[in-house]
Amino acid sequence: MNPYDLEWLNRIGERKDIMLAVLLLAVVFMMVLPLPPLVLDILIAVNMTISVVLLMIAIYINSPLQFSAFPAVLLVTTLFRLALSVSTTRMILLQADAGQIVYTFGNFVVGGNLIVGIVIFLIITIVQFLVITKGSERVAEVSARFSLDAMPGKQMSIDGDMRAGVIDVNEARERRATIEKESQMFGSMDGAMKFVKGDAIAGLIIIFVNILGGVTIGVTQKGLAAAEALQLYSILTVGDGMVSQVPALLIAITAGIIVTRVSSEDSSDLGSDIGKQVVAQPKAMLIGGVLLLLFGLIPGFPTVTFLILALLVGCGGYMLSRKQSRNDEANQDLQSLLTSGSGAPAARTKAKTSGANKGRLGEQEAFAMTVPLLIDVDSSQQEALEAIALNDELVRVRRALYLDLGVPFPGIHLRFNEGMGEGEYLISLQEVPVARGELKAGYLLVRESVSQLELLGIPYEKGEHLLPDQETFWVSVEYEERLEKSQLEFFSHSQVLTWHLSHVLREYAEDFIGIQETRYLLEQMEGGYGELIKEVQRIVPLQRMTEILQRLVGEDISIRNMRSILEAMVEWGQKEKDVVQLTEYIRSSLKRYICYKYANGNNILPAYLFDQEVEEKIRSAVRQTSAGSYLALDPAVTESLLEQVRKTIGDLSQIQSKPVLIVSMDIRRYVRKLIESEYYGLPVLSYQELTQQINIQPLGRVCL
């Protein structure tokens, strides 16, 4: 072969897209054009080769994602087999000859007995259809469903790892792509298994059509006796069925191996994984050897065979057990060296540790980090809390809070704890409890007033105050339908957890904005606002930027509009070095958002005001130091002022509209700190944060 021919072949080999297109066109022509027996033999051999190669690939891949194109390959191979079946059927009916492979397969399987041949063919087809294909189809369906259900949790875990600095942005992007690819593959496999199932059904139909059509043609057109025609066409038909079903069986096994493969970080090929996991249980092999020995002692059983098998399995288990003991001793010696080398007391080496953790205790202690967001729930509630529903609720809460505040909250960890009280749950930030509550088995949580429940005749039990100024009641699940008809709001256990968690996250939102999170937000903006990011980093240090975002979020101001916030930092950052005052200027740049938020989209803002004398009193008590400014009001004046606020505002929960308190910009922050212990939910705004379109509706004025 000359160099030009080799170069031409190399070019064709590089254009795999053209090769696939040619293959698909060839499949179509195979169904239409008659093929000579020699070509059929070659194509049948190619079909068998493809199925064997695919089976070997399935055995040696480390993860199903390494062969993510398999669903498409399954479709192509199924079409190829069906086209072959059409071609061989045409040749059998027209010429009573479908090539050497078909005849040899048929003659070998039938073995001179038509009934035996058909029975063997049916057994192979039924095994493929009812056992392998049916099981693989179910596994693919469940895998697709579970893969989709697990996506939100995996995404949250990736977000948490990225914010904790465990992985960078690129690795997080790769992990998200892997999750998406995995979901798409299992979803495709769920549908692709229908090809294999349909192929098995088509094989059963084709064999009966071929026998019936062949006998009819042999008797009516070729003048053969019925018995002779049945013998000839049955051999060819069974051979055709076998050369189609054997590759189909191999590919069905391939599909089964791929969808049932459980991959992990240390996975290798399938044989190595199976061998590694089997030999890891020497006790099971020892017990198996004893059972085989007992089988050998049963009268009538082949004693010698079972004794040999019992000896092999028992000896293998004994040798593996000895090897495992030696490895455990070596690990214990290594642990002793590590602990003594670190200066730990000698008694520490005798502490009981699991085999998986030996030799790594020091590493775990050095690098173990607290969980940012943890929910501990009494283990008795595990069945009552539906995992999928709870996961959906938690994802919805994080999404809603992000859209409202712009804070990228970390993943939420749920832990069922046996040491907690009955029905108790605990919400912890950085593993420090900040809120707790109780879930009552067989009950729903209702936030409506007592009068409404009594009016409907629904018995209730008073619940604990999960949130300030909000009474809750427990109502039996028997009354769920009545609550729905009365349009009264109620919560399941999953909804109680997420509702309580949403308030906790909103209250402690500023704790989730640190330097790492600020850097992440800036990186997200670099693609569209590169120059702005460079300028703001030049003017405002990252630490000050973080503190500003914390102050905004701490007062329930969203930071999603990062462009306006950063532009305000650039505008005022060089003029104002005090972070508190700089935050006030940034708030004024967000006036449109603030007015829309607290006026509920209207032009009227119900508000309480401070008298000029009160403002002057507070202003004169502000002290400036090198460390910052603070309010130094006399305790008696503070108490008098708070008393006037209580008289003027009263109980916020009894007010229909959501009012605000408006003061001058220079004292706004100090007034907020002054009243937040009693009126945490009352927003404090400055006059500079109001747009021209807003009309203030005075509800009262605080005077001394």
Swiss-Prot record:
Keywords: Cell inner membrane, Cell membrane, Membrane, Plasmid, Protein transport, Transmembrane, Transmembrane helix, Transport, Virulence. It is a multi-pass membrane protein. Pfam families: FHIPEP. InterPro entries: FHIPEP_1 (IPR042194), FHIPEP_3 (IPR042193), FHIPEP_4 (IPR042196), FHIPEP_CS (IPR025505), T3SS_FHIPEP (IPR001712), T3SS_HrcV (IPR006302). The chain crosses the membrane at residues 20-40, 42-62, 67-87, 112-132, 200-220, 238-258, 290-310. One of its GO terms (cellular component) is plasma membrane. The keyword Transmembrane applies. It is found in: Cell inner membrane. Disulfide bonds: none annotated. GO terms for biological process: protein secretion. Belongs to the FHIPEP (flagella/HR/invasion proteins export pore) family. Could be involved in the secretion of the yop virulence proteins. This is Low calcium response locus protein D. It comes from Yersinia enterocolitica serotype O:8 / biotype 1B (strain NCTC 13174 / 8081).
